[in-house]
Amino acid sequence: VEQHDDDSRWRLCWARQPSRPYTARSDVLADFPDLAAREAALGIRPGQPFLLMADGRPDIEVLEFFRSAAFQSLAAGSQESYAPDIQLFLSFLSVQGIDWRAATFEHLADYEFWRRRDQHNPDRVGAATFSRDLAAIRKFYDWQQWRGNVAVSPVVLHQPSASGDSDSRRLQPSAVRSVQLKWLTPRAYRRWRDVGLGGYRGDGMRDTTWRGRNDGRNLAFAEALWSSGLRLREGGTLVLGEIPNADSQVRYAKARVGQAVAKGRGRDFWISAAALKSIDNYVISTRAAAVHRARSEGRYDALTDIKVVDTVDHHRRVHFTNREGTKGTVPLDSLAWRDRLNFYITTDRGLEPWMVWLSEAGLPLPYRTWEAIFSAANDRCQNLGVDIHCHPHMLRHSFALRMLVTLIYAHERKMGITPAERREYRHIFGDPWVLVQTLLGHVNVETTRDCYLEPVSGLQVDLFLNDDVAEDTSIADFITHIAAAAPGIVDTEEQ
């Protein structure tokens, strides 16, 4: 099956953000000044995704799914990924003239072949991505079947195969972990950062043609993820009140990430003093300039649905006042990323967004924007002959590997303690895996092991057997030493 043409694809849309200035682009919409109230009455949440047919007409049964409890109870990240997954499957059916209500297991099997193995599809995906596709399609059809809109879901066929499994089970990839994680060594990260985000050339010299207006912001964000291991959504939605003060007496400062942006589980995190200094420099320079421009152009005055923070109490409850002067409170932990876009603070110079990361226009930067920024940095590296690729989550992986190697190295060689003292240390603080689990916020230590066991497999044995690694070797050098034997670790340009 060939790629879908644009005129046959279902359209992925999002409900309006009330905090953003909005001008009706249609005379029809202009006739409904109470549109926001109508949407709220129907349970349509600001920024929520939904689908329209290729010609722009609504399919009520599809729209009902997107405002159902089954969909809206999903984590924000799952909603954002499930919507385009469902869009793609419905488009796959539409281009063949198949109504989604008539989809069968055979159609789903065709889709699996096209998505993963069809040589005519230039955008084939791996096991992990298709597993997510299947989860989204199952969620959609389970709800439609429950509502009586389809008789049988194409994802669930209770007809056992010769092996005893249902047919649909055969579509579930058995090797989801076959997708290779990648990590950057410290020197590879610095090279990617300097060239991709910082305006250097491949030869290490400054690029005189570089016009990076936001390099202060972008460098500070990369340093924040690199030094803290925060997920993209966690780091990309931080508000000013969540950034700890840089303390010259400590190398890492502790802070807390909110529950609603941390996969439903708030947690402590640690961030380096160097990263905090980069953020401070961004706040007083590039960010301050963007805020000044926005104020001068009256951009904040045009916002109608913002909440101005009065204070955050010791219970982490945010006290705020809205545009109408009505006061309210909300737990900081319950603020999802879209909620955070609407919160502002007042300084002696006027209003400004509460979120740390802003666009050039002085408005909060939706965290997914960072994916495009990293992609542009990768393109710049590629064009300048630096064959290092990085995405935001790769910085989290790299942080975890760096911490794990550091802890194992400290336990086995550098602490200078007896075996009995080492056992006592582990009894009090836990082994390196548990400590890294804490740093990453994983619920289960097995998740940590599943992700990071391969690159450090045999590391403890290697530390005892290979005395050629000097005692004064730095952790960065040591990671470079083991990178040679771990194909997933990117140290210099990939060959």
Listing of model-derived features with the role each one plays in the protein:
Residues 62-78, 86-174, 208-209:
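N-terminal core-binding DNA-recognition domain of tyrosine recombinases/integrases
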Residues 148-150, 225-249:
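Short, charged phosphate-coordinating catalytic segments
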Residues 194-232, 427-430:
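Basic, Lys/Arg- and aromatic-enriched nucleic-acid-binding interface segment
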